[in-house]
Amino acid sequence: MTTKIDISPKNVYGKCDLKCAYNFNYSGSNSTAKNNGIVISLTYDNSSVPPVIYNNQKYTVSKLNLYSPSLHLFNGSKTNAELIVEHVPVAGGDPLYVCVPVIQSNNSSTASSLLTQVIQGVSSNAPSNGDSTNLNLSGFTLQDIIPKKPYYSYANTTSGVSGDYLVFGKFEAIAIDEKTITTLGEIITEFPLDMIGDKLFYNPNGPNSDVGNQGIYISCQPTGSSEEKIDVTMAKNQPIYDLSSILNNPIYLFILQIILGGVLFITLFFVINYIFKYFSASSKVSNSNS
């Protein structure tokens, strides 16, 4: 059953952690921005290695879309804007959308600075529908934009926007000041699209930055369900031993102390025995001379 999606803790059907694991390692990019009237679309360079693994599938970045106001509802209402990053699977299939709300606030972060530069660049060089501009942004990377915080997930089967959606909550929103929010509203208009999807799940772990961690699979289940389906594969990582790790291991230190104590005891035994024999021999010589 599909419903209108409202990103809120009260609407969570269950927890989805390992199957919904989102691992990323984005590289930097040069981007071109296009003003499409209802959305600002940005290109993104892809590295030689797919930057994202989601549910054991590798993805590359297709494009970034910035909407104002947001497409999703957050706790019953829309936010000032929303950044949606579209990914396409290397092996083919439905896209993966990673969505980050944008709110008006004076709080500042690297993501705030980068997004502000995008909006200012489009406002200055591509203010009208159909305009494009090259964004010469230093250090522009999704690695600094996507939050490393818990997120929600759901599947959307609506024609044209079908795929898996990962949506960060309002507490993880990118903060933009009032002037920049006003500027954004002057160069694009609202995109009247309701986000429809299946049950809303929650991943409390958040993403990480290791695209090679594919050791475990678990299906999404409602909270409290005992019929979870788990397939586990052995991780390929092997332990690495070095002198530092050995010296910091209490077991190894205990064994080392025993060995050193034994060596010291044997050494002392031979030294004392040698001294005893030496003085015994000296005593015999003295007695014989007498």
Stretches found by the model and what they are:
Residues 1-290:
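Alpha-carbonic anhydrase
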